[in-house]
């Protein structure tokens, strides 16, 4: 049995986690055509909640119809979607675990057909396409920006007060709408929403303030991916000062946690970027401090996760490790890591099959876990 600091308890929002292994938010296209979570989703999250005291973060969830930028992604508006999510939440809570919903708006990164089929258009911080040859979005006007802020707030209320989520994670990463305002590679505005570090930060910070006011500071997290070049991001000259300012403001709001993602594909495209002193987010981790949890994602496996918490950040108890692909194929992942049990391999071909349980809820638990099935849940 492992004695790694991965398996020490940590305060998190209004709860206490039994370990530091977190389910990553992952888009899997398992909602129906209207964005209502299918029953597969309840099974998926319940399986991964089976080790008591686990933290789960959901798929990216559209906050309103115009932010649903892809088919078969879930939403959190209207009573039918809220009710379906409540079933998921109740099942997770019955296992003794915790679940936070990720609030999402796609902006220029949306699938154009998914919008135009509903009479909607691409919108972003500026008229800058996600890549050369891709459709050019409209620059959102002042009224639209204010409405987006309200939509995030309502989405948070629907999640926490309606569906019973333990909190919400605001998706500010991976080139989606908040990132499109935050980074000058996309944001070319000259009004109060662009043109300076402070102005580019304004959209994400106003959203965060509104959500904090709506559901409480200890129910709000933020995900960022400073170094990701996915969807046209990560190429600005003042990247470190931009994110230093943004993270400082988040810290002052006393939100529950910060989630930082490193990008494996950035390293594959440009291995030299690894030599930048801030590439692995150490500067931002230090800025965040030791008071509140910080989630770190970036292709971790069991060995690198242990090194992260036991060596790199051995001086702090607030670093949690986010797993995606390995959690897909190992619903009992925390148990396997603690007991030193080999991981099952994942199948990429089944990651994104719409409306299907294949490769989603059909990975088995290990025999050692099942031998304890008479317990309500396995202690983390």
From Swiss-Prot:
A GO molecular-function annotation: FMN binding
Residues reported in the UniProt entry to bind substrate: 171, 174, 352
Keyword Flavoprotein annotated: yes
Signal peptide: none
Annotated positions binding FMN: 25-27, 60, 102, 171, 223, 299, 324-325
Lineage: Eukaryota, Fungi, Dikarya, Ascomycota, Pezizomycotina
Transmembrane segments: none
Summary of the function given for this chain in its UniProt record: Probable inactive dehydrogenase; part of the gene cluster that mediates the biosynthesis of fungal ergot alkaloid. DmaW catalyzes the first step of ergot alkaloid biosynthesis by condensing dimethylallyl diphosphate (DMAP) and tryptophan to form 4-dimethylallyl-L-tryptophan. The second step is catalyzed by the methyltransferase easF that methylates 4-dimethylallyl-L-tryptophan in the presence of S-adenosyl-L-methionine, resulting in the formation of 4-dimethylallyl-L-abrine.
Family named by the database record: Belongs to the NADH:flavin oxidoreductase/NADH oxidase family.
Annotated consequence of substituting residue 123 to E: In strain: P1 / 1029/N5
Domain of life from the UniProt record: Eukaryota
Organism: Claviceps purpurea
Record-given protein name: Probable inactive dehydrogenase easA
Effect the entry attributes to changing residue 118 to Q: In strain: P1 / 1029/N5
UniProt-listed InterPro entries: Aldolase_TIM, OxRdtase_FMN_N, Oye-like
Record's keyword terms, sorted: Flavoprotein, FMN
